């Protein structure tokens, strides 16, 4: 395993310091804060919703040294160097987006993760196969190391990742290099969650199930608990769609689960066909395959979700699939907006926040205590307006649905430092 990134090293060190503090360690950054100690940042008066603690109510959050040090009903403003007024706002753990494209300058569709924060409230993003074995090191060294947003990744089974887009990366199956992919996952196990493969007909041509088989083999050969992330939508045949679902293991991720995209012949071969849920989809869900939204610019269809959700295939995670093309699309797949669409489909606020914090954080399972506001967790916080009233949403096939609630980003704090005011002085961030 390669060395931890500086960001994750510091997060890991904080958790160790917390444990050491209970044994009387001297100088622990996470030692219990005293009544005369000051916080670097106080987020005051917000409506805190933290599914990891089954917490909902007005709370103040005190952050010091980049770590949540207090979560109380009332913390005097005088105890903080800076105060962020969250009165009347929804305050949650920083959002965790399991499907993004955040490899600018390397992938053909990547956006700088830090540019997304104002629109997404994302403190943690997962690169969904932007890089493969040949360019993952560049993503790690030159992008992730310079980014305030916490980044993880799925390594693409194609050795060049999404660099050739819009040219398909797996028309030539020889680009799916199992050993090289396995090595990349193993050597970056602190950052690489697993392997990504896109199984649409316009990506794999006539290669059938073989790309997925190679990707699963790369996971297994890595010697790590690597997961698959499998992109569907426009699969060549209905039979192949069922084969894909049957091959997925518990804990593997089916992304674009509610896609309504047609294949190259115009046929609809997704998890809902002719208005009915595929039996293989329900079987996959029941054995523990993770259903991820991955809205994107062409991969979310209300009519699919409206059959799948009551049929037993609710999402486990809500993600954006944000990239340079989807970000300009009418569906506006910024994460809070996608969460709002699922409230329009009948999910509760608590459910959609769980699907964008606690659950994806557990899937990542790397840095301690992300996706939570527990004491000792990194100071990652999302602050949003909850706008109540009629709102209209559009999917990626121009279907419209009306909702009654919209989440709008207000402010985001990463490792205890806001993106914007109030600025930390000196501006030293991890």
Model-derived segments and their meaning:
Residues 1-17:
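N-terminal secretory signal peptides and thylakoid transit peptides that target proteins
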Residues 22, 26-42, 47-92:
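Histidine-rich, glycine-flanked metal-binding segment
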Residues 46, 378-429:
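C-terminal cap of metal-dependent C-N hydrolases
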Residues 77-78, 85-146:
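Metal-associated gating/positioning segment near the N- to mid-region
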Residues 101-103, 130-131, 156-160, 197-202, ...:
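Active-site beta-loop-alpha junctions enriched in small/polar residues
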Residues 120-126, 130-131, 146-173, 196-203:
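Metal-cofactor-binding active-site regions of metalloenzymes
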Residues 176-291, 299-316:
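Histidine/acidic residue-rich metal-binding segments in metalloenzymes
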Residues 303-386:
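His/Asp/Glu-enriched, well-ordered alpha-helical/loop segment
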């Amino acid at each position: 395993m390669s060395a931890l990134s500086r960001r994750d090293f510091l997060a890991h060190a904080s958790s160790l310091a917390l444990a050491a503090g209970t044994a009387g360690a001297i100088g622990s950054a996470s030692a219990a804060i005293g009544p005369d100690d000051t916080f670097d940042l106080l987020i005051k008066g917000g409506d805190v919703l933290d599914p990891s603690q089954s917490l909902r109510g007005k709370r103040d959050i005190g952050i010091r040294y980049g770590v949540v040090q207090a979560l109380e009903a009332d913390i005097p403003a005088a105890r903080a160097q800076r105060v962020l007024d969250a009165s009347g706002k929804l305050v949650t753990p920083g959002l965790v987006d399991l499907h993004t494209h955040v490899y600018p300058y390397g992938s053909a569709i990547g956006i700088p993760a830090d540019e997304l924060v104002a629109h997404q409230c994302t403190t943690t993003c997962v690169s969904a196969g932007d890089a493969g074995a040949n360019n993952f090191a560049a993503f790690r060294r030159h992008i992730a190391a310079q980014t305030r947003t916490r980044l993880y990744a799925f390594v693409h089974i194609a050795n060049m990742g999404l660099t050739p887009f819009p040219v398909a990366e797996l028309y030539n199956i020889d680009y799916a290099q199992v050993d090289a992919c396995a090595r990349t996952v193993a050597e970056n196990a602190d950052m690489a969650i697993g392997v990504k493969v896109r199984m649409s007909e316009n990506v794999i041509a006539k290669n059938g199930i073989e790309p997925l088989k190679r990707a699963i083999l790369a996971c297994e050969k890595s010697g790590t608990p690597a997961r698959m992330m499998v992109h569907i939508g426009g699969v060549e045949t209905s039979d192949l769609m069922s084969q894909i679902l049957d091959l997925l293991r518990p804990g593997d991720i089916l992304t674009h689960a509610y896609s309504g995209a047609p294949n190259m012949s115009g046929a609809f071969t997704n998890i809902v066909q002719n208005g009915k849920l595929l039996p293989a989809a329900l079987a996959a869900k029941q054995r523990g395959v993770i259903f991820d939204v991955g809205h994107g610019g062409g991969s979310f269809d209300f009519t699919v979700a409206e059959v799948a959700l009551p049929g037993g295939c609710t999402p486990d995670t809500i993600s954006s699939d944000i990239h340079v093309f989807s970000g300009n699309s009418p569906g506006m797949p910024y994460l809070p907006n996608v969460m709002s669409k699922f409230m329009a489909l009948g999910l509760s606020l608590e459910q959609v926040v769980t699907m964008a914090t606690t659950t994806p954080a557990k899937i990542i399972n790397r840095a301690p205590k992300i996706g939570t506001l527990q004491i000792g967790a990194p100071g990652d916080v999302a602050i949003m307006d909850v706008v109540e009233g009629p709102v209209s949403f559009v999917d990626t096939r121009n279907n419209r649905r009306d909702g009654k609630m919209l989440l709008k980003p207000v402010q985001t704090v990463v490792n205890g430092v806001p993106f914007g005011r109030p600025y930390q002085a000196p501006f030293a961030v991890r």
